[in-house]
């Protein structure tokens, strides 16, 4: 097993090399490192001081938009957001001793994929391949594990909670019930962690009032939002995210060869339809 004394080598450059990160992924990791190295990363702090620091570094970010420091990385579809999640986790674990991550998926398909990509070394797309810091596979907590298992988070090197936002919203009241194994509710257990990082895949799905409130109540140390569409619709109006720190649009992804140019297929002879 790798000694934690060896974690010093897990710089952003080292992680980017081992994980073969693409340019926008590597840049996102560097930005996270710069921000974390500049702010006071702690729970229950004055968000305005951290916002001032982040805004000075990345003026596009004008508001964290949540009750905790939350940063959006707006990357075009096809660039590889799941691998970037893995890079974020590896960096925060090795460089800042963060051991608890709560990953939110926008639907069942992505949720099932994330469980495999983050927790199954036999999966061809397992994101932590080659990283010695994860010689022991991260402990995945998903589905109804919070009810059925005697969860002792302190026993694991790293815990990754994976939840589908729909199930999370539906199960929220049950998660707030007292858990006989924990001695408190699962929600209280999570909220009490001083190192919980919330990672939101396709985060534009989590800005509805219900999901917004439920995630705020987890009181995470940090939020990391990944989306290709950093805005929400309010009627006919488009409301852009205010907490974006990095944008890599579709035009850049096409120019760099990471995704194909979208094409609309048409048909000339359609009289018989």
Language-model-detected regions and their locations in the chain:
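Short glycine-/polar-rich loops that comprise or flank the Walker A/P-loop
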Residues: 97-99, 158, 194-195, 219-222, ...
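Conserved interdomain linker/interface between the two RecA-like ATPase lobes of SF2 helicase motors
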Residues: 238, 242-273
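Motif I (Walker A/P-loop) of helicase-class P-loop NTPases
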Residues: 81-91
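Conserved nucleotide-binding/hydrolysis micro-motifs of P-loop NTPases
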Residues: 108-111, 166-170, 204-205, 229-233, ...
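Conserved pre-motif I regulatory segment
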Residues: 2-74
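Conserved RecA-like ASCE ATPase "motif II neighborhood" in helicase/translocase motors
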Residues: 142-153, 158-214
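Conserved Walker A/P-loop ATP-binding site and its immediately adjacent core
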Residues: 97-132
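Conserved helicase ATPase motor motifs in RecA-like P-loop NTPase domains
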Residues: 73-79, 202-206, 217-237
